[in-house]
Swiss-Prot record:
SUPFAM superfamilies: Glutathione synthetase ATP-binding domain-like, PreATP-grasp domain. Pathway: Cell wall biogenesis; peptidoglycan biosynthesis. It comes from Glaesserella parasuis serovar 5 (strain SH0165) (Haemophilus parasuis). InterPro entries: ATP-grasp, ATP_grasp_subdomain_1, D-Ala_lig_Van_CS, D_ala_D_ala, Dala_Dala_lig_C, Dala_Dala_lig_N, PreATP-grasp_dom_sf. This is D-alanine--D-alanine ligase. Residues 104-300 form the ATP-grasp domain. Keywords: ATP-binding, Cell shape, Cell wall biogenesis/degradation, Cytoplasm, Ligase, Magnesium, Manganese, Metal-binding, Nucleotide-binding, Peptidoglycan synthesis. Its cofactor is Mg(2+); Mn(2+). Cell wall formation. GO terms for biological process: cell wall organization; peptidoglycan biosynthetic process; regulation of cell shape. GO terms for molecular function: ATP binding; D-alanine-D-alanine ligase activity; metal ion binding. One of its GO terms (cellular component) is cytosol.
Length: 303
């Protein structure tokens, strides 16, 4: 049966810190599906309860909720309970990958390279000198479970470390303090198990923060960014990382080079942005996907 005969909901918005980005992504996805002739409805989950989707006649979901329940397995579990197929990763992969700490533990357990880190939990005494002695300066401080660089700080001096940790703790009870990786930054999309060309990110500012991602027009995206050998190298690493955490459908994996040019894994985005600034469509375009066809392909991979 053609998916065009089904009633499809684009779930977007929601209540996470990434609501605004999700609203933009949802609008783009909704318009793309509409233009292709799908029977589609845009539903902001802040306004409409998920458990009533079945009553509304919804038969399939395109999930474009960033962060929060849209990416942590809660939505996925609810949709499985309702018997509604959905785009993107399943319950387990969603739950694991929204937690950067546990994602890195898994990768490290199978020998995949990541930045060295220290973990700080809410209420724990922090010894700045000890952390800096171990990881050096500058450092990155980030909440374990937020996306879109919400709550992330670059720390250049010892005095900045505690305030940065306090800021990150506003968003999560677990905070990661990571070594600075001095090399280039890449984001690597995966579509149906196929690794697409890496996109190099040259941020407008100190690092790829919320402003550089969504507001600035001066952040540069270079794609394809790597020669064939380096692309093959990063693709092998990214595919291993994707498989270890159990991703399916589509995801985007962020990677950085260290000072020696070795690739290190950073994090997984199981529900990548689909706005005018977004990385996934930029990469997919280089291998022949229009935005509309990319959206349709993600929908076709729903399960």
């Amino acid at each position: 049966m053609s998916l065009k005969n089904e009633k499809i909901a684009v779930l977007f918005g929601g209540v996470s810190a990434e609501r605004e980005i999700s609203l933009n992504s949802g609008k783009s996805v909704f318009e793309a599906l509409q233009s292709l002739g799908y029977n589609v409805e845009a539903i902001d989950t802040k306004e409409f309860p998920i458990e009533k989707l079945k009553e509304k006649g919804i038969q399939r979901v395109f999930n474009i909720l960033h962060g929060g329940i849209g990416e942590n397995g809660v939505l996925q579990g609810a949709l499985e309970q309702l018997g509604i197929p959905y785009t993107g990763c399943g319950v387990m992969a969603s739950a694991i990958t929204l937690d950067k700490f546990r994602t890195k533990l898994l990768w490290n357990a199978v020998g995949l390279p990541t930045a060295a880190m220290e973990v700080v939990r809410r209420g724990q005494a922090v010894n700045s000198d000890e952390i800096i002695a171990k990881l050096g300066l500058p450092l990155f401080v980030k909440p374990a479970s937020e996306g879109s660089s919400v709550g992330v700080s670059k720390v250049k001096t010892a005095e900045q470390l505690l305030p940065a940790i306090e800021e990150a703790l506003k968003y999560d009870s677990i905070v990661l303090v990571e070594e600075n990786l001095a090399g280039a930054e890449y984001s690597v999309p995966v579509l149906d198990g196929e690794v697409l060309p890496a996109v190099q990110i040259i941020p407008d500012g100190e690092f790829y923060d919320y402003h550089a991602k969504y507001i600035s027009d001066n952040t540069q995206y270079v794609v394809p960014a790597l020669n064939a050998d380096r692309q093959a190298e990063v693709a092998k690493l990214v595919k291993q990382a994707y498989d270890v955490v159990g991703c399916r459908g589509w995801s985007r994996i962020d990677v950085m080079e260290d000072g020696e040019g070795n690739f290190r894994l950073v994090e997984v985005n199981t529900c990548p942005g689909m706005t005018s600034h977004s990385i996934f469509p930029k990469s997919a375009a280089t291998v022949g996907y229009s935005f509309e066809r990319l959206v349709e392909r993600v929908l076709e991979l729903s399960a």
